[in-house]
Each structure stands twice: as C-alpha cells, then as structure tokens.
Amino acid sequence: MAAPVDGSSGGWAARALRRALALTSLTTLALLASLTGLLLSGPAGALPTLGPGWQRQNPDPPVSRTRSLLLDAASGQLRLEDGFHPDAVAWANLTNAIRETGWAYLDLSTNGRYNDSLQAYAAGVVEASVSEELIYMHWMNTVVNYCGPFEYEVGYCEKLKNFLEANLEWMQREMELNPDSPYWHQVRLTLLQLKGLEDSYEGRLTFPTGRFTIKPLGFLLLQISGDLEDLEPALNKTNTKPSLGSGSCSALIKLLPGGHDLLVAHNTWNSYQNMLRIIKKYRLQFREGPQEEYPLVAGNNLVFSSYPGTIFSGDDFYILGSGLVTLETTIGNKNPALWKYVQPQGCVLEWIRNVVANRLALDGATWADVFKRFNSGTYNNQWMIVDYKAFLPNGPSPGSRVLTILEQIPGMVVVADKTAELYKTTYWASYNIPYFETVFNASGLQALVAQYGDWFSYTKNPRAKIFQRDQSLVEDMDAMVRLMRYNDFLHDPLSLCEACNPKPNAENAISARSDLNPANGSYPFQALHQRAHGGIDVKVTSFTLAKYMSMLAASGPTWDQCPPFQWSKSPFHSMLHMGQPDLWMFSPIRVPWD
C-alpha cells in the first residue's frame, strides 16, 4: 500500500507541489520541480540536488558543449573548464540533436597519464557537466517519484534501501580484501565513475582516495532500472512495474547471403517517458588491474545507446574496441521460488557485471566467464556476444567463437557457443523468451504457456514467427532496419490475438506500438493493453561499421506502417515528457562522431 507523503512533515509541500505540477507548463515545471529537492524526500532523499547549470533560464542544453576536468598539480584540486584542454584528466562533448534526429551524442575521453581511479571519477564528472539538463529532465520523466518524494511503498522502499546499502558495503569489503584483483579493480572504477557523475551534478568535486559512499536512492536508481524489474518481486513490492508478458527488446543477428556480412540489430522496448536518448562514445585508458604493469583493458573504446545520467547502455547494445558487439533482450523470471537467490551479499548487480565483462573480455567465452561471476539474479537477460574477429567475410563457418549465447536467471547461468546454428539457419533472433530449455523450465514459463498458450512459447510466439518468416528478406542494412521497425499489426495475421477484442494487437510485432491498442478493448494479460510503451529505437551495425565504432540508428516509436507517435495527440499527453519532441518522426542516421 502506497504511503502518501502528506502525513509527513513535508506534506503541505507535497500537496502544493502536486497542484503546481498539474497546472504548469514544462518550462515552469523545471523550476517548480527543483523545489522538490529542498522540500521533500523519500526514505533517503532520492531527488538529487540541482547542479550549478540550473542557474540558466533555458532548461534545454545548448546545441554543443565541451568541458574538461583539470588537476591543479600544486594544490591537488580538480576544476572544470569549458572547452577541450589536452592536459585534462578527462573531457567530453555533448551535441544535442534530439529535436532534429531524436538523439544527443556524447563523446568522452580520459587521459592515460593519470591513474585509473582518477580517470574513472573524472569520466563521471565531465559527463554530468555537459549533460546536466538532460539528466535532470530524464530523472523527472522516469524516477522522480520512485521511493519518494510524493508517495511510496514504505516497506518495500526501506527494504530496497537496506538491500542496496548492504550490497554496496559488501562490494567495498571485497575491493579491500582483493586489492590486486582485476575484477574488483574494474568494479571499483565503475562505482567511481558513478560517484563522479553524482558529485559533479551536485556541484562538488572531491576525489575519494579510500572508501567512498554511493547514495542508494540517488543516481544509482538510473543505473539499476533493469535490476529493479527483479528486485521488486524479490523484495515483495506490492505494486510492481512490469506488466505480465511485457516485452523488453527485439534483436536479430543475420548472416547475409554468401556470408559476405554479418549484421547485428537491436530495438529497445520501453516506456515512452524514457525517450530522452544519448548515443555515447567512451575512449578510456584503464588498465586491467590496479598496477601500472597491467596492460590496457580490451574494451576501453566503446559506443553504445544510452540515457542521460546512465554510464552503461541499459538497452543493452554495445560496439566494443575489442571486436565484440554485445546485446541482450530481457527474459525475466516468473518462478517465485528462485527469488531466494537474490541476496545483497555475494552478488554484483547486473549493470556492473555487464560493464566489467565488456571491459575485460577478448571473446565470447571470456565475456561469459566474467559476467556470470557473482550472479545477482537481477535484470535477467539473454545475452548475445558477437565476435567480429572470428567472422570471415565471404568465408566458411569458423565453427565457433562468432556467436556466444548466455542466459541468466536467479541461481542459474547457461552459456553455449551458437556459431554452428547461426551458419546453419543464417540468423539468431531474440525476443524476451529463453532459448535454453533448462532456463525456460526453471523460470516458470511452462505455467504461462499452459495458462495463456503459444504467446509465451519460444517457437510459436508472434515475434518468433515473424522473424522466421521475414529474416530471409534481410539482404542489406536498409532491409535490416525495415524488419527491426516492422509493425503492420492491422494487416499481419501473425499479429492477431485470438483472445483479444479487437484481435489485431500492436504488441505483437518486431517493434511494438502498444499506444495504438484501444483503451476499451479486452485483453487476456497486461502487456496486450493500451500502454505508453513500445519499441523506441533501432540500432544496426555490420562488420565494416563496427570497425569504425559506428552504427545506423533511429530514435522513437516506429512509423513505417503506423502513424507517427505524437505526445499532444496521444492518450498519454499528460504524462511527463520534459525535453522530448512532440512529434516522433525521425529517419535512421549514421552516428556522426566526426
């Protein structure tokens, strides 16, 4: 049961601010909502303090901004300066083209003359300094009321705060007990980057030399949005976010005719409130371990689709300088008996394991070995690791190493090389249902198949059938984009839901448009209802593009066979969507790093 904040000492402020938020424009909202940090808080004061950038009147970031973090050798003090400085610890540029292309672009580099820890902290600092307005708006659109400030489920929020604090404390102990471990070195760097992001946003620059704290309900919330999907049921949250059957991404890996190329594509399914998007390029200079004799990590250079204030992808889709492309779709867990494996000690949350594996791995097998350590049982996904180093254009199957598949649920991780299957069938499709029978059965999906039918089966799900039917049409990049944006639910028989009224359902497509389902329809489970949810992008790369850390990308809900999504004309026009374009009608672009 949600506990309203009105009963607390800040209740008058909550009521006043709610009335103000209901009546005001988005521009004014940026100013009014800033009061929240002063007047209200959840169990741990979830809303971050506004940074110095909020002295400006315009809440949108400029078209382009570059900032550098410098270290004063004499005083040891860090300071931010506008522009690029070659001696800086780190520097970043944000180019904001959200209203032109649907994307902003972040280009961030660190300086190998400084130690890894300072580089990591500095990376967080400069990212926040160039994107603070977008971070604020994304926070307001997505997590401002998660465990406060207006109302929250007290019991769950206290359990979540305690879980995260215990987990952070356990990781700090492991870092201290294993000072020479490359694994724990990378975990520490990841948390230092998050610390730098939060410190910079709050207007303070204090590099931590020993133990440091991360706010459990601060910017960590932006990193753990995927982990929360499983922490909520594991911690017995009464009102959980995920809808039964809700998809969370489609992916396709396609071997083109004659084996002349291998395309990798992904589209993210998410709430439309999450459509403030940034494609990020990191050029880091981290070493594998804490001593200088360690070599540089394989995955220092990476490009990924992401969100403001998020230091990993979350979609997930990465192009790595190691020659790997890593991506996932969420499979979840529907077996309550497995939640016992979700514990704060002995686990590293998925978002961190993802970052560490991307840095350290040279191939799919080592990626899986790193990732499966300290399985948290949260953000349970099917991961696909494509190794372009093993792919031979126009050549025969190398037999192994091109494609590794990993599936995780609480208490279980299954890994297999699927190169032979990829070359036999010419494609691998992923659509939120486990491939491995042991994972499928253990995660409780058999019961859902028995109750609801083929919609929850691996081979007969609507997306499985559409991929099987249409993957042979993919002969180039443009055709891949078309398939990944495909949604002809009004005319495609594979989009029909026999138990629904009306039967055509916009969820049953490669790129969902659940906003187009009638509000007054009847549906057997929640995912098929009308929702402000669907496919919100597409990203595609190839053997050649990946060499140049590049991709084709389109932002926003598909409009190929459907009308474009427009906030002002949608049933969800009153949902907060600060900083977003009203009309989402963007074509694919090649990401312009130069």
From Swiss-Prot:
It holds the Pfam family Phospholip_B. Keywords: Disulfide bond, Glycoprotein, Hydrolase, Lipid degradation, Lipid metabolism, Lysosome, Signal. Glycans are attached at residues 93, 115, 236, 441, 520. InterPro entries: PLipase_B-like, PLipase_B-like_dom1, PLipase_B-like_dom2, PLipase_B-like_dom3. The p76 protein is synthesized as a 76 kDa precursor which is then processed into a N-terminal 28 kDa form and a C-terminal 40 kDa form. The C-terminal peptide is further processed into a 15 kDa form. Disulfide bonds join 147-157, 497-500. One of its GO terms (biological process) is lipid catabolic process. Its EC number is 3.1.1.-. Coiled coil: none annotated. It is found in: Lysosome lumen. One of its GO terms (cellular component) is lysosomal lumen. Present at highest levels in spleen, lung and brain (at protein level). The keyword Signal applies. Residues 1-46 form the signal peptide. GO terms for molecular function: phospholipase activity. PANTHER family: PHOSPHOLIPASE B-LIKE 2-RELATED, PHOSPHOLIPASE B-RELATED. Belongs to the phospholipase B-like family. Interacts with IGF2R. Putative phospholipase. This is Putative phospholipase B-like 2.
